[in-house]
Each structure stands twice: as C-alpha cells, then as structure tokens.
Curated annotation (Swiss-Prot):
Protein species of origin: Homo sapiens
Lipidation (S-palmitoyl cysteine): C70, C71, C104
Record-given protein name: Interferon-induced transmembrane protein 2
Cytoplasmic side: 1-56, 78-106
Subunit structure: Interacts with CD81.
Membrane topology: Single-pass type II membrane protein
Length: 132
C-alpha cells in the first residue's frame, strides 16, 4: 500500500487571504438586515401516515378452502383481492369499502360453515338414535 504525502503551503505567507465579497453579501452589508413588522410565517404540512387497511385475504382464503358455504368464501376472497389492489393504488377509501364487504362475507361464511358443520354432526347422531 503506497501512501503519498502532499503538503500544501499557502501562496501568500504572512498576509491574510484576499476574500471576494459576493454580490448578495455586499447588498446585505450595505442595506443591513431587513426590518419586517410582521412575524415570519410558517407553513405546516400534514403528512398522513400509511393507513393500515386490513384486506382479510388469509381469512377469505381459509373460508374459500374449508367453509365455502354458498360460495361466500370465494366471493369474500374476490373482494379481499380488490381491497388489496385498491390499497396498492393508494385509494384508501375504496380499499376500506372492499375490505368491509369482505369482512362481512367472511363472518357470514364462518357462521354458516360452523352451523352446517354442527348440523352434519348432530343429524346423523339423531338418525342413528331414532333407529334404535
């Protein structure tokens, strides 16, 4: 590894460096500081944080695969995908609307799926007991 050492010596040794005054600095020096009677105004910018919109895709996929009562799980999955698409585009209001519909459909699919599962267990038991 080669190290090159360079030393720089000032050209005008013993004399202060000659500075050029910029035009703006010269105007400020001649005119002085501006005197405004009004206080300086400030601008406030509100940046909205990323609003988290749940799209319920996993829940819809579960209902589609396991409890697809009256195709509610599949329809909920379609609305969940639409909600995710709206969220990616930046349309938070549209994403919330589709997510709300997907949530309602998922709730109904879950309730009807549980109800039908219970009926599929109870009805054969009752039929077997009635035959005895």
């Amino acid at each position: 590894m080669n190290h090159i050492v360079q030393t720089f010596s000032p050209v005008n040794s013993g004399q202060p460096p000659n500075y050029e005054m910029l035009k703006e600095e010269q105007e400020v020096a001649m005119l002085g500081v501006p005197h405004n009677p009004a206080p300086p105004m400030s601008t406030v910018i509100h940046i909205r944080s990323e609003t988290s919109v749940p799209d319920h895709v996993v829940w819809s996929l579960f209902n589609t695969l396991f409890m697809n009562t009256c195709c509610l799980g599949f329809i909920a999955f379609a609305y969940s995908v639409k909600s995710r698409d709206r969220k990616m585009v930046g349309d938070v209001t549209g994403a919330q609307a589709y997510a709300s519909t997907a949530k309602c459909l998922n709730i109904w699919a879950l309730i009807l799926g549980i109800f039908m599962t219970i009926l599929l267990i109870i009805i054969p038991v009752l039929v077997v007991q009635a035959q005895r």
